[in-house]
Curated annotation (Swiss-Prot):
Protein name per its UniProtKB record: Trefoil factor 3
Stored CDD domains: Trefoil
Species the sequence originates in: Rattus norvegicus (Rat)
Summary of the tissues where the protein is detected: Expressed in goblet cells of the intestines, and colon, in paraventricular hypothalamus and supraoptic nuclei. Weakly expressed in gastric epithelial cells (at protein level). Expressed by goblet cells of small and large intestinal epithelia, kidney and stomach. Expressed in the paraventricular hypothalamus, arcuate nucleus and amygdala of the brain. Weakly expressed in gastric epithelial cells.
Function statement: Involved in the maintenance and repair of the intestinal mucosa. Promotes the mobility of epithelial cells in healing processes (motogen).
Gene Ontology terms describing biological process: maintenance of gastrointestinal epithelium; regulation of glucose metabolic process; response to peptide hormone
Length: 81
């Protein structure tokens, strides 16, 4: 019974995750792609898909019109002491 609950939960998570295609951050941390719309640096071209954008190492977010949807991520900084 526990196995069935596990697979049901996994299926729900996968379905919920795949239903939201506005933001894609494959291989990047979500914090790297939290770039304000007014400072996004274009990383694609007008008809770029989220997959093509991610293959370039860039973030994809089509939820805001009239700004680059494929844009360069923020650089993560390392703390040095």
């Amino acid at each position: 019974m526990e196995t069935r609950a596990f697979w049901t939960t996994l299926l729900l998570v996968l379905v919920a995750g795949s239903s939201c295609k506005a933001q894609e951050f494959v291989g990047l941390s979500p914090s790297q792609c939290m770039v304000p719309a007014n400072v996004r640096v274009d990383c694609g071209y007008p008809t770029v898909t989220s997959e093509q954008c991610n293959n370039r190492g860039c973030c994809f977010d089509s939820s805001i019109p009239n700004v680059p949807w494929c844009f360069k991520p923020l650089q993560e900084t390392e703390c040095t002491f």
